[in-house]
């Protein structure tokens, strides 16, 4: 049914999930990519979406007959192409919305409880971001661990800011970057518990995690998860339990791919990197499989979400995206501002300074392009953010930093930042 690119160097097939698979090609020209797109049309697949980000090209084609979709990406700077064939699922709309009385768009970094590592007396993990859009609805990004304080911090914030929207309950789109417990644990509890879930209306859940077949040794194959095993213990169980909760809650699920555009209330969300782009480079850690996306609000102000992105992901961004894409007003500091979990000594980084593990070139790039607000999902008192390490970070990322000791809210019109009480 589907022809594939015949020229260029092809990697082994990559089993993603849900009967989905990917071919990755190097040495592909734009003409060869165009020929492949034509072959999809010749096979009577219908075009659902096309997108360009800088010099990169993306397309989604669907076959109702076979219940399949084909997502294709071409990265011009590196002459690489990705072909992903998967079951036909939810397809996002990129259309804007007429809103008569738009609300001021905001972006909040919530103060949350964190896991304490008794060995070094530091607190690690967890992040929750909440964007409120012109229509009053919310986009939540990730979640903290399954602590009561985190649950009430999130639900109370949503309910307090739902006033005046006209909605009976907060309207939520929930996007996840990767499957570590400090990013999905709280969400899993809310989704699985009717009492908590009924306090909000979940319109869409969006994620793209590794397949179990691709987990590798870095997934601790134990039966416990979330807070019972620490931040990262039992990641395999964590993802399985999260996906079971997603299925049980009955919400619409969207498996995004790079180049996809999801528009909600005139906020444009572009997915820039997934684990499908990093392949065939090996995943040394779950963080290396995470997603990066950019939110451009109706005001034109933008937010770059890095999750726990590693230096490999940072290099992919620098190698494949132009200045217009990387120019943002607000950035989420990757991996809670801490050092990388990647095997930097096996990569091309200078390991003499731990901060180099996070590719300071990316932070310098966004700073040079005018980024003015840095949201760091960690406590300012953590010693791993202090001293020369903190100085090194600030020398590259020169924006004003805000930590989640308190809940900070960014006005996405003026970029003014205020504490939420």
Can you describe what each PLM-predicted range is?
Residues 27-49:
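Amphipathic alpha-helical segments
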């Amino acid at each position: 049914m589907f022809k594939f690119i015949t020229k260029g160097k092809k990697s082994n097939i990559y089993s993603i999930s849900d009967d989905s698979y990917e071919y990755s090609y190097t040495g592909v020209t734009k003409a060869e990519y165009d020929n492949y797109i034509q072959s999809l049309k010749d096979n009577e697949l219908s075009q659902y979406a096309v997108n360009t980000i800088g010099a990169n090209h993306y397309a989604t084609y669907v076959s109702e007959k076979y219940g399949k979709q084909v997502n294709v990406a071409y990265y011009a700077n590196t002459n690489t192409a990705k072909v992903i064939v998967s079951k036909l699922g939810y397809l996002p709309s990129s259309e804007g919305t007429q809103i008569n009385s738009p609300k001021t768009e905001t972006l909040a970094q919530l103060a949350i409880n964190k896991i304490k590592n008794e060995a070094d007396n530091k607190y690690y993990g967890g992040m929750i971001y909440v964007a409120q859009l012109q229509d009053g609805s919310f986009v939540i990004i990730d979640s903290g661990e399954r602590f009561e304080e985190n649950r009430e911090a999130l639900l109370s914030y949503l309910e307090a800011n739902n006033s005046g929207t006209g909605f009976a309950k907060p309207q939520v789109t929930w996007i996840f970057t990767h499957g570590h417990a400090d990013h999905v644990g709280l969400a899993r509890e809310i989704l699985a518990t009717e009492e908590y879930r009924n306090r909000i209306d979940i319109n869409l859940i969006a994620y793209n995690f590794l397949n179990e077949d691709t987990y590798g040794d870095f997934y601790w194959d134990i039966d416990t998860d979330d807070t019972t095993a620490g931040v990262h213990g039992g990641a395999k169980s964590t993802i399985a339990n999260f996906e079971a909760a997603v299925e049980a809650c009955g919400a619409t699920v969207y498996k995004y791919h790079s180049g996809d555009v999801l528009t909600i209330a005139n906020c444009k969300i572009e997915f820039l990197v997934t684990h499908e782009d990093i392949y065939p480079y090996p995943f040394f850690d779950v963080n290396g499989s995470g997603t990066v996306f950019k939110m451009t609000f109706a005001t034109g102000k933008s937010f770059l979400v890095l999750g726990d992105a590693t230096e490999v992901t940072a290099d992919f961004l620098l190698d494949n995206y132009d200045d217009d894409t990387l120019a943002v007003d607000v950035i989420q500091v990757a991996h809670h501002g801490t050092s990388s979990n990647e095997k930097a000594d096996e990569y091309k980084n200078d390991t003499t300074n731990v901060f180099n593990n996070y590719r300071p070139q990316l932070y310098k790039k966004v700073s040079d392009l005018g980024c003015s607000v840095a949201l760091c999902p960690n406590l300012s008192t953590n010693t791993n953010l202090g001293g020369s390490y903190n100085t090194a970070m600030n020398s590259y990322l020169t924006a004003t930093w805000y930590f989640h000791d308190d809940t900070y809210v960014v006005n996405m019109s003026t970029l003014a930042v205020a504490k939420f009480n």
